[in-house]
């Protein structure tokens, strides 16, 4: 069952969260997949919903973070989040390159397929 507090603050839909939970991946692998999917959804939001092209650059990531009401309460978290976005971006760009698509074209299904093929 999906915690309502998590769902209301997540950029992932309930069906996307369920899709991740329904995989036969370990708890750690599902967590990693959720983090990547969460970052991908944030990147798409930063790109104003574009579904193709490169991931937003560091400057656009910072602007997006500063515009988030939930981050305005704890701006000391923004550098940590930007570091996490940078790490996720590297991983997402690698997956996109392997699939021959742009990073913003990635979908949750692509990420699930990549993780399950590694196991």
Q: Predicted segments — roles?
A:
Residues 51-73, 103-119:
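Short, basic amphipathic alpha-helical segments that act as recognition/interaction helices
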């Amino acid at each position: 069952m999906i915690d309502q507090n998590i769902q209301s603050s997540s950029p992932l839909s309930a069906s996307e969260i369920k899709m991740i939970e329904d995989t036969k991946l370990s708890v750690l692998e599902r967590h990693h997949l959720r983090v990547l999917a969460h970052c991908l959804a944030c990147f798409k939001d930063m790109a104003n919903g574009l579904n193709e092209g490169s991931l937003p650059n560091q400057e656009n990531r910072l602007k997006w973070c500063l515009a988030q009401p939930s981050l305005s309460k704890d701006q000391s978290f923004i550098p940590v989040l930007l570091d996490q976005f940078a790490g996720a971006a590297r991983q997402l760009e690698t997956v996109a390159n392997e699939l021959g698509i742009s990073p913003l074209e990635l979908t949750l299904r692509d990420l699930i397929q990549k993780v399950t093929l590694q196991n």
